[in-house]
């Protein structure tokens, strides 16, 4: 049984919305073509966070549902939808393990945007299988750096990730934390396709959608990116959070007086399993 820790992303919701790099600009077209999406049917986005995927994909469906256990993430998702003028999303505060009861189907597509690994994976995948309409799809979506060639630098210096992570370690120690405990181990075998293959879905398809080659971010966006991670969320720093932020800003100013950086989050990996 997965135990939910409500402090995992404490203070991170707004940073998650503004600090995470976007998935491939071709994601909607890829899913529409692969799954025959035509504006009908229902979408369920599990572990939706501040609605990054939910809001992007909602226009491909008649109705979308964003599900997340964190009320602050849900609130950010609502704001994001309102900002974009999207009115066909229902927001549900619940865990993936609460399915199907928390958000009954049927659904044409159920997505997990970098969230599947937080769940009781086999149990949740089997629940999703029952919730999908015939021919529906479970889709895992994530950034995948290193899966393809790195594009040429468009000009600004790259984000100095190693130096920022050294600052995180300086403040928080070498053992990564999440909420009130240790961060989950980094997956070493796959990104979930091995788990899905053990369920009724069988072996999924894996597709790479080209990432943004010329993504440029400013200092505050880079800092928000780090505050959006469970292992460097604001609450972990306690009363030293402003000192950490100041050091990161000083480091970034030294690397780029203009305050802009090139970010290459990688291509977008899509793991697609049909019912």
Where do the PLM segments sit?
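Class I SAM-dependent methyltransferase SAM/SAH-binding core
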Residues: 42-44, 50-98
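Conserved catalytic/acceptor-binding region of the Class I
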Residues: 129-130, 135-213
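Short catalytic micro-motifs in class I SAM-dependent methyltransferases
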Residues: 113-115
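Conserved Class I S-adenosyl-L-methionine
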Residues: 185-275
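Conserved class I S-adenosyl-L-methionine
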Residues: 1-38
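A short, conserved alpha-helix within the catalytic core of class I
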Residues: 118-128
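A short acidic, Gly/Pro-enriched loop at the edge of an enzyme's catalytic core
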Residues: 101-110
């Amino acid at each position: 049984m997965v135990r939910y820790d409500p402090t995992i992303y404490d203070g991170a919701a707004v940073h998650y919305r503004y600090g995470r790099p976007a998935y491939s600009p071709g994601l909607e077209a890829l899913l529409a073509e692969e799954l025959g999406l035509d504006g009908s049917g229902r979408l369920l986005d599990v572990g939706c966070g501040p609605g990054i995927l939910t809001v992007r994909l909602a226009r491909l469906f008649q109705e979308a549902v964003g599900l997340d256990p964190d009320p602050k993430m849900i609130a950010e998702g609502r704001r994001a939808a309102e900002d974009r003028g999207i009115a066909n999303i229902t927001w549900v505060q619940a865990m993936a393990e609460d399915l199907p009861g928390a958000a009954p189907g049927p659904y044409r597509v159920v997505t997990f945007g970098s969230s599947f690994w937080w769940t009781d994976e086999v149990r949740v995948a089997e629940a999703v299988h029952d919730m999908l309409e015939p021919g529906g799809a479970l889709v895992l979506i994530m950034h995948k750096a290193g899966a393809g060639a790195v594009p040429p630098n468009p000009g600004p210096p790259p984000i100095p990730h190693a130096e920022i992570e050294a600052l995180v370690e300086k403040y928080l120690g070498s053992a990564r934390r999440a909420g009130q405990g240790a961060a989950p181990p980094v997956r070493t075998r796959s990104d979930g396709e091995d788990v899905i293959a053990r369920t009724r879905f069988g072996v999924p398809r894996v597709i790479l959608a080209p990432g943004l080659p010329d993504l440029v971010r400013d200092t505050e966006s880079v800092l928000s990116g780090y505050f959006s991670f469970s292992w460097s969320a604001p609450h972990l720093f306690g009363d030293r959070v402003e000192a950490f932020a100041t050091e990161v800003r000083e480091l970034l100013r030294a690397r780029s007086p203009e305050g802009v950086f090139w970010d290459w989050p990688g291509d977008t990996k899509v793991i697609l399993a049909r019912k």
